[in-house]
């Protein structure tokens, strides 16, 4: 079912009542007013009035004067307030994973697909600590080196959790974990034909990035440097060119080591940053998660504000007139 809500098209699995829709959107029905196809829906009727395919809805609330300056970003028709995406691996335990994700403010978390431990099926799983009802799970193909393995993995992920929004990564070798672009292109084509919405890990090559966008990928995720290296963004110029070349969201994926790396990615104009090791392997992962949250926000504000032009000469801050 397709709905247009506040001017944006959104997809839902089935028809539902206004009350159920607000619940799925995480909106408190007591604090909003709803208009459906230009007709106001009385609050007393939220549980009875159905929304159907093609309906147009406006959901409004009171604000404290002026416009809402929330700086969200949208991928595959879904809107998120946090531009920080985090991985769930490499932590000492699931409890630390959950605490770090909470501190980061992230709404999207990547999850790898692995076989169930049949020798101990009662062993705790990630979903026991990090709920897919609270966060958007982004299944990925970490550890896959061929297009066929990647496609197979994501089909299993969709069967397990019903997720169509996925992160594709096809690795070239175990030493660099650099993206294998021919296999990535092959896998992306197959997944898109199969109805997946593909966010794709790729090289920092603007030509390849444009090819992936033209195929139908919903987000381009060039590496800043090698996965887990912490080397930061080695080629900021190519990242900027990719951002200028494609229209879909661009998120730096891999290589971030500290908060300044995350801020730089955002200052380049990127729509977001995905990281895992930088938080999980910090001496204090919870504190680093908070640092990354603030770095993303600071870098984004800096980009929106616009930096001063660089000069090759001095320009005094104080006025020169009236000197004694």
From Swiss-Prot:
Domain of life: Bacteria
GO CC terms of this entry: cytoplasm
EC id: 2.8.1.10
Protein localization: Cytoplasm
Primary subcellular site in the record, as a coarse category: cytoplasm
Protein name: Thiazole synthase
Main function: Catalyzes the rearrangement of 1-deoxy-D-xylulose 5-phosphate (DXP) to produce the thiazole phosphate moiety of thiamine. Sulfur is provided by the thiocarboxylate moiety of the carrier protein ThiS. In vitro, sulfur can be provided by H(2)S.
């Amino acid at each position: 079912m397709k709905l247009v809500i506040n001017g944006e098209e959104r997809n839902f699995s089935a028809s539902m009542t206004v009350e159920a829709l607000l619940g799925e959107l995480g909106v408190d029905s007591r604090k909003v007013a709803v208009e459906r196809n230009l007709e106001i829906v009385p609050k007393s009727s939220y549980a009875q009035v159905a929304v159907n395919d093609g309906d147009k809805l406006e959901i409004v609330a009171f604000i404290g004067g002026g416009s809402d300056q929330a700086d969200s970003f949208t991928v595959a028709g879904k809107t998120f307030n946090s531009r920080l995406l985090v991985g769930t691996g490499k932590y000492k335990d699931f409890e630390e994973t959950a605490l770090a994700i909470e501190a980061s403010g992230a709404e999207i978390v990547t999850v790898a697909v692995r076989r169930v431990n049949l020798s101990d099926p009662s062993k705790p799983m990630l979903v026991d600590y990090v709920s897919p009802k609270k966060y958007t799970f982004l299944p990925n193909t970490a550890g896959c080196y061929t297009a066929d393995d990647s496609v197979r993995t994501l089909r299993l992920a969709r069967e397990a959790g019903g997720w169509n929004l996925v992160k594709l990564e096809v690795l070239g070798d175990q030493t660099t974990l650099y993206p294998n672009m021919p296999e990535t292109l092959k896998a992306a084509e197959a997944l898109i034909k199969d109805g997946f919405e593909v966010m794709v890990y790729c090289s920092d090559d603007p030509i390849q990035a444009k090819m992936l966008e033209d195929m139908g990928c919903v987000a381009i995720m060039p590496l800043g440097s090698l996965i887990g290296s912490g080397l930061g963004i080695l080629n900021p110029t190519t990242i900027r060119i990719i951002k200028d070349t494609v229209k879909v969201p661009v998120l730096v994926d891999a290589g971030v080591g500290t908060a300044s790396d995350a801020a730089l990615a955002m200052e380049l104009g990127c729509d977001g940053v995905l990281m895992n090791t930088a938080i999980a392997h910090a001496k204090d992962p919870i504190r680093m998660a908070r640092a990354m949250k603030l770095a993303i926000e600071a870098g984004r504000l800096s980009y929106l504000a616009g930096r001063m032009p660089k000069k090759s000469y001095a320009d005094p801050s104080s006025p020169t007139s009236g000197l004694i």
